Amino acid sequence: MKKSFFLFTLVFLLGCSDSKDDLSREIDTVILDDLIQHSNEFDKRVYSFDNGLHLAVGYGIANSIMVEGIDGNIIIDASDSVAEAEEVYSHFSKINSNPIKAIIYTHNHGDHTFGAAYYYNLDEEKPMVIAHESTSEYVERIMGILNPIISKRSSRMFGTELPSGDVINVGIGPYLGVSQSPIGYIKPNITFTDELKINIAGVDIELYHAPGETNDQLFVWLPKHRALMPGDNIYRTFPNLYTIRGTPHRDVKSWVKSLDHMRSLKPDYLLPSHTKPLEGEEVLETLTIYRDAIQFVHDQTIRLMNKGHSPDEISHMIQLPPEVSSSPFVREFYGTVRWSVKSIFNGYLGWFDGNVSNLDPLPSEDYARRLAILSGGEEKLFEALQKAVESEDMQWALRLSDSLLALNYKIDSTKKLRQEAIQYIGDRALNPNKRNYFLSSANELNANYQAEPLLPQTSELLSEISIDMFFDILSVRLNPEKAKGIKQRVCFEFDSGNIKTITLRNQIAEVSSEKTNCDILVKTSEQILKEALAGVRNPIMTVASGDIDTGGQRTNFLNFLSKFAE
């Protein structure tokens, strides 16, 4: 019971490391020239405009914006860590050091919210923290039930465990910097549903809900400045209509509508949350091209779906028209048309592609065994893998290695060949998400690979997170083998007056708010329980000290908690 429940790994992804062996092989760098040139988009600097708008680019994956007011300033998007926010503000404050009156989150992603505590704690008078009404819920999802898998896949996509020399950029920024600095998320204290018009420090500000890259996305419109802050709904690369780290379905039609709302305002300035700013006629032209690219992919996917084509087929059939694809704003340095097509299909029809062969397919091990028989045996299948790697037919090599690994055949040799294939593809990938994901996956196949250690979570961060999320996580952490035949009800009575109850039965954990027929009644504070579950406190010592009062059932309570550990 001494180990942490590790509820918050995504928050603490490490930045690129210089300590590992460089995975990249010698290749013709001409292949990567366009991606290398794309890094110029993230040259570190603050762009300042005469109207009091300032955009910090290149200090991390996301931009941060300062708007000067009469007696104070407004921060739009707060960077991905306290340290990064501090660096950005060291430049902002040289321009104008008036107090921060408000922090606005354009959406829930950590690179826009996790540096907020730095600005929040600068002065005794605390600023407003403004966001869409659903943002805090989505922040908690980042740290919630899918945290382990999203954390791992995010680490791969952003290359956080790769040597710094392998990460050319991450498509919408130079790198993901959440790592060595404390996380400083502050829960919003002003929220809205559809729109909010407010004057802050003499600045008229209009906020509009604008679903797109996230469902909680908003954009900021400054009518007197004619300035638009679109959040992550537009940046200088094809959008992530689907992200390979994993995400709920992104409503592409709503994304287009949000961009049309922005276009209707006819802005003179565009200050995005990723990549460089635009001004003048280029703003409206770019917004139009961007929305047209998204609509084209959506509409043509639907057209081909209705003709009976599968996601894989459609992903190879759709190409942007030349008048759209010529724009630098739809180069595939983040999202791709191919991945977007599959996500759109899944969003409308779900995972089943309509082919009966795929409704209840053979298990992978059974398929691999039959493939080996067709090949003349497992050794012949292995020889085919060797030949595929030698001939640089690497995607076929990956498919063959899948089958050999399913058969547990020559595991070490198969993994080595698989690693070579993954690395070959990754080294030559122009899309940073694909490149980093492949090179990270190759790194994980090293015999001495160890996942980066987690940095400790803080009490300050936990205080911003709802206790409900912890109980949701406990529900999905239940180990069914440990819960066989168990019927038990544990009630939690918090000093806030809140009641939570977990009932174990049929190898599930039901969470409710009923304090009846309790086998164990636990009395404590929400914060203490959160700290114990997250590893800030040692659970055993916290129970032994009485900070978690179990009514004399310490051993039974610790045994109960053990059922939620692997």
Label for each model-derived stretch:
Residues 48, 73, 80-82, 137-209, 254-266, ...:
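Metallo-beta-lactamase
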Residues 387, 393-399, 403-406, 410, ...:
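Feature captures hydrophobic
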Residues 43-96, 219-232:
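Conserved beta-strand hairpin/beta-sheet module of binuclear metal-dependent hydrolase folds
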Residues 20-36, 147-154, 160-167, 172-173, ...:
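Accessory terminal helices/loops
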